[in-house]
Design a protein with these regions (language model features):
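Structural detector for short beta-strands of small beta-barrel domains
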Residues: 7-41
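Beta-strand/loop nucleic-acid-binding surfaces
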Residues: 39-73
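Flexible glycine-rich surface loops and low-complexity tracts that mediate binding to linear polymers
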Residues: 17-20, 76-91
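Short intrinsically disordered terminal tails
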Residues: 1, 136-137
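Intrinsically disordered, low-complexity acidic/polar segments
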Residues: 26, 43, 90-92
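A generic structural signal for short beta-strands and their flanking turns/coil linkers
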Residues: 15, 30, 56-58, 77-79
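OB-fold/S1-family single-stranded nucleic acid-binding modules
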Residues: 35-37, 84-136
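Transition segments tied to proteolytic processing and entry into folded domains
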Residues: 1-7
């Protein structure tokens, strides 16, 4: 059981793990098995690696709508996700804790990727000057 999650019931958390496997369920959702998830307390003023650790688990299952995996899944891909700690009953009647995923924005990562593409494309022409700061304005 994921007992370390119990004190955080209904709390919002930040997570990182690796996609291990997935399957489409009868109800249309996708069960995505995340291996070695790291679960941390959120703090917008601290980088993820430096956040307070709640727990490191063996695995967590995420149940996602088809639109949430429209970009496809790749085995062993690192994934960041957010959610709320929830308690559920397993089919054998035992209780455990999991994470109900919530929407997550990776806009900052997309901006960084655009910046890198621009720098690489414009780097050969010294008349074209672009910085990370003026790209973000």
């Amino acid at each position: 059981m994921r007992d370390k999650l119990a004190p955080y019931l209904s709390e919002y958390v930040l997570c990182k793990g690796w996609i291990d496997n997935w399957e489409k369920l009868e109800d249309g959702k996708n069960r995505v098995l995340i291996k070695s998830p790291v679960i941390k307390e959120p703090n917008k003023n601290v980088m993820f690696d430096d956040l307070k650790l709640i727990s490191k688990e063996h695995h967590i299952n995420l149940f996602l709508e088809p639109k949430e995996v429209k970009g496809g899944l790749q085995r062993l891909e690192e994934i960041y996700f957010t959610g709320n700690i929830n308690r559920y009953t397993r089919s054998d009647g035992t209780r455990d804790y999991g994470i109900h995923p919530t929407p997550y924005s990776s806009l900052h990562n997309e901006i960084d990727a655009v910046y890198e593409d621009l720098v690489n494309a414009l780097n050969d022409d010294p008349r074209l000057f672009i910085t990370h700061d003026n790209l973000m304005k």
